[in-house]
Amino acid sequence: MARRRVLLFLKPFDVYPPRQCAGSAASFPTSLSPPPSQLRATNPKVLSYLDDRCRVHKDTIDLCQSVLENKSLDWTSVQRNNFSQPIRDVDLVITVGGDGTLLRASHFLDSSVPILGVNSDPTCPKEVDELMDEFDARRSTGYLCAATAGNFEQILDATLDGSRRPSELSRISMKLNGIQLPTYALNDILVSHPCPASVSRFSFRKRSNTGESSCLINCRSSGLRVSTAAGSTAAMLSAGGFVMPLSSRELQYMIREPISPTDSDKPLLHGLVKQEQHMLVVWYNQEGSVYFDGSHVVHSIQHGDTLEISSYAPTLKVVLPEHLLMKPSE
């Protein structure tokens, strides 16, 4: 039997300001640290917290690499910031970081390669409680990550032997002026003016495969957010949306901070785009941006551009954490 091929997709260390930036001795090899910069934090507890986050992340990477080294696998690792090509010729992608790292890797995957997320730095509730009056000590959420350092080998073995099967999650597809954009969003997209203080002007309607259209809604607002079922627990929920079953192929949309909507328009500013529908958006600002799963992937748009948003995208195979598999809504 051919040896299976695994890609280890890593969160970089430059998201953790090292202690050396504050003038103290570095705790980690120079090769793992970003170029020195001025860290304004002086609270020793903040510095110790940042130092520990980097250490925990490094320890998790070391553990994952050690586990892979001891198995009959062909594997290689890459930092997410150094990757820009479609992922091919592998049997499994393992991300080490949090949800952001998993989302970044998903942009390079089609529906054929499964992905397993390892939360390298989970939040410690006791730490959060102890430091609540000083700073926010929450770490990585890892909502879609099935593994941590504590159970990585167990989850990996179950994935490789087929006893832990990946789930297929819906993604968002977008066409710009009829041309398919190459990125599919696993969580959500945001369409807005690039300046958050500026008004976004656009109109939208929903259209079915049979050609039936809803009424046109003209908007002045802070933008448009569209989420998948997986993304409905993130920014969409924070903005007042609702959680969708992970198996849903529908999309949820919400107009952000609408300006003086009419009474007839108000019920239409938040709703669902069904699987057999797509949303047509016409942009009326001189400039605009479409953000895919956060701020890293951005497409520019301009006045008169038409966006077609739908769930007509290849699904993503994700090894989900146990608590999501056990949800009754699934």
Where are these regions (language model features)?
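Intrinsically disordered, low-complexity regulatory regions in eukaryotic proteins
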Residues: G23-S24, D136
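A short, gly/pro- and small-residue-rich
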Residues: A105-D121
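Short glycine/serine/threonine-rich phosphate/pyrophosphate-binding segments
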Residues: G100-S106, S232-L237
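Short acidic, S/G/P-rich loop/turn micro-motifs used as interaction or catalytic elements
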Residues: D14-P18
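Catalytic phosphate-donor-binding core of small-molecule kinases
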Residues: A2-P12, S31-R40, L47-P86, T123-R225, ...
